[in-house]
């Protein structure tokens, strides 16, 4: 299927250039009901490509509003380098995380209403296309239910014929009903989808993608049942007695993937940090960690993640956006399994002087080294040079207001070429992001070619571990977690509990757009984020008169990042339903607090 690797195909054929002025996107479908569309395989492929492209998967291009306001910037993973944008608000904003995907659902339902009569396809092909469309629809309902709780369940393309519009004004289903629909759909289509794909069909759904969606969705449902509260007569929240069944369903779906033998943790590189880095860059079919991937290439759909996240001295224009916090860096253990706190002071509390500042990160979890650009680490043939200031021989500290400020009659800048400063674009924490970034060249706007693994095998193992530990099967949870730790290159655990499983998920899946949803489904976001002052790691050059700068040492200080603490209001566990959805359908009840 040509160009499905970028999920767009021949969009001009099925552009659906119509606007919604009705209840649940009941737009005209004359074009899509045209027999010429369903008698042309190219047109069907184009339509299918559009459904994939519209599917909400929160990939590298998913951000809030504009200019790289990524989900991680609203969590404990990172802060935003820029001083503008809603990601900086002390009060985490409402409504910006929403996705009311009924136009996308309608497009799928229209496809499903017609595909089984498509003359251009064999009966066997029709079943596969039907299953793919239902997979896309289940993904979209998952995107909505994790945001809003229960939403109206629409499985046919609604058509307004000029009669009573009330027949189209469907109320919200209960939250558990949407999760059950996703589970039932995934189970129904699994046998209809092929076990594997190759060639130009590589990026289309397989039965294991359906298992992975079922696994993730059931994990979320179980979490809501156990840790959330039921309100609005079940429109939000899930009865607690349903939790065990959902944990078991998540575990069973994971087992189907694990026991298939078709997937494995990526181990192509000998160096553990390099291996973790290239896990996200190796697009070959030999990368068996990929279960379902969305592809990007500059010929059809280039990415912007590199452009917005390049360190200061490596950027083209925008850059620097995602700054991992020192708190988050400390979450990565050392290779021997010891606590990950950075060793900036000796046992007496005095600053340690480092001749090589990268030694501060010696023996850290290789996943940290593969995910985060830290002070003075190598990058794109140079180094990421981060310095907050200079300590004079008399012990006083000099800091800069700009990157060009020089130290007392020398040519040495007070801050290094990549920061840190309290203003401008440079890092506010001492760190930049490395995961997903192109290591060998600077990438311009919409020229990124890093693919997005919607589902990868390590997530399945972590889902499995979480379900097992919640069901009391710590032996299996420990086994799954230690497979991941072994690949990472850190010491195995000898026992496991719920918090340790969550910790493993936090560091393994960092910056992959899981953390925001995880802390919401566990209902701990307010505990983690409210009044939390995130920290920065600031390197200082210890000045010695008469020495070359390259011979001087560094100390590090863990200091407050120049960002306000945040507040996560309890109502944010569910999103505000868009006002236009309610104004056109009085049967839709708004979520509490809005």
Region locations from a protein language model:
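Short coil/turn linking the two alpha-helices of tandem helical-hairpin repeats
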Residues: 145-146, 152, 217-229, 472-473
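Sec-dependent bacterial lipoprotein signal peptides
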Residues: 1-18
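Conserved, well-structured interaction surfaces
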Residues: 40-59, 77-148, 166-202, 356-357, ...
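Short, surface-exposed recognition loops and adjoining beta-strand edges that mediate ligand/DNA contacts
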Residues: 61-77, 154-159, 193-212, 225-323, ...
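Long, intrinsically disordered, low-complexity segments
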Residues: 19-20, 101-104, 181, 272-336, ...
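Membrane-proximal, proline-rich intrinsically disordered regions
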Residues: 20-63, 358-360, 582-594
């Amino acid at each position: 299927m040509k160009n499905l690797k970028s999920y767009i195909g021949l969009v001009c054929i099925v552009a659906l250039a119509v606007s919604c002025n009705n209840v649940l996107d009941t737009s005209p479908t004359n074009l899509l009901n045209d027999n010429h569309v369903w008698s042309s395989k190219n047109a069907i492929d184009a339509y299918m490509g559009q459904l994939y492209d519209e599917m909400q998967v929160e990939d590298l291009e998913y951000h809030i509003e504009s200019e790289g306001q990524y989900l991680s910037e609203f969590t404990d993973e990172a802060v935003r380098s820029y001083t503008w944008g809603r990601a900086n608000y002390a009060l985490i904003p409402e409504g910006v995380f929403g996705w009311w995907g009924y136009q996308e659902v309608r497009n799928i339902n229209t496809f499903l209403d017609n595909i089984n009569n498509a003359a251009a396809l064999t009966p066997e092909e029709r079943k596969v296309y039907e299953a793919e469309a239902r997979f896309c629809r289940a993904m979209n309902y998952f995107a909505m239910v994790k945001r809003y709780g229960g939403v109206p369940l629409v499985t046919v393309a609604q058509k307004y014929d000029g009669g009573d519009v009330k027949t189209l004004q469907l109320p919200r289903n209960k939250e558990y009903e949407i999760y059950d629909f996703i589970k039932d759909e995934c189970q129904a289509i699994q046998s209809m989808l092929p076990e594997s794909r190759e060639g130009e069909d590589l990026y289309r759904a397989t039965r294991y993608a359906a298992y992975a969606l079922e696994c993730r969705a059931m994990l979320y449902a179980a979490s809501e049942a156990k840790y959330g509260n039921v309100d609005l007569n079940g429109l939000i929240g899930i009865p607690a007695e349903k939790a065990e069944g959902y944990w078991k369903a998540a575990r069973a779906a994971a087992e189907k993937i694990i026991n298939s033998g078709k997937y494995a943790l990526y181990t192509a590189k000998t160096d553990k940090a390099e291996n973790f880095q290239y896990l996200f860059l190796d697009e070959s079919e030999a990368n068996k960690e990929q279960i379902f991937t969305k592809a990007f290439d500059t010929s059809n759909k280039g990415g912007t993640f590199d452009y917005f996240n390049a360190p200061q001295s490596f950027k083209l224009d925008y850059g620097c956006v995602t700054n991992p916090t020192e708190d988050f860096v400390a979450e990565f253990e050392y290779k021997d399994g010891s606590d990950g706190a950075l060793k900036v002071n000796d046992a007496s509390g005095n600053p340690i002087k480092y001749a090589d500042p990268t030694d501060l990160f010696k023996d850290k979890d290789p996943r940290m080294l593969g995910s985060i650009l830290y002070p003075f680490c190598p990058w794109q043939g140079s180094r990421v040079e981060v310095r907050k200031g200079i300590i004079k021989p008399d012990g006083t500290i000099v800091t800069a207001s700009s990157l060009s400020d020089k130290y007392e009659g020398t040519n040495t800048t007070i801050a290094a070429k990549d920061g840190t400063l309290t203003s401008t674009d440079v890092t506010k924490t001492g760190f930049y992001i490395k995961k997903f970034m192109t290591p060998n060249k600077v990438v311009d706007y919409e020229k990124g070619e890093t693919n997005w693994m919607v589902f990868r095998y390590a997530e399945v193992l972590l889902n499995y571990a979480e379900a097992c530990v919640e069901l009391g099967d710590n032996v299996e949870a420990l086994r799954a977690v230690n497979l991941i730790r072994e690949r990472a290159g850190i010491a195995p655990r000898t026992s496991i509990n719920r918090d340790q499983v969550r910790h493993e998920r936090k560091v393994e899946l960092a910056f992959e757009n899981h953390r925001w949803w995880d802390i919401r489904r566990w209902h701990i976001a307010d505990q983690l984020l409210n009044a939390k002052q995130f920290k920065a790691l600031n390197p200082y050059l210890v000045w010695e008169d008469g020495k070359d700068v390259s011979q001087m040492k560094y100390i590090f200080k863990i200091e407050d990042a120049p960002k306000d603490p945040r507040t996560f209001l309890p109502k944010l566990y569910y999103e505000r339903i868009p006002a236009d959805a309610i104004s056109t359908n009085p049967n839709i009840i708004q979520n509490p607090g809005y």
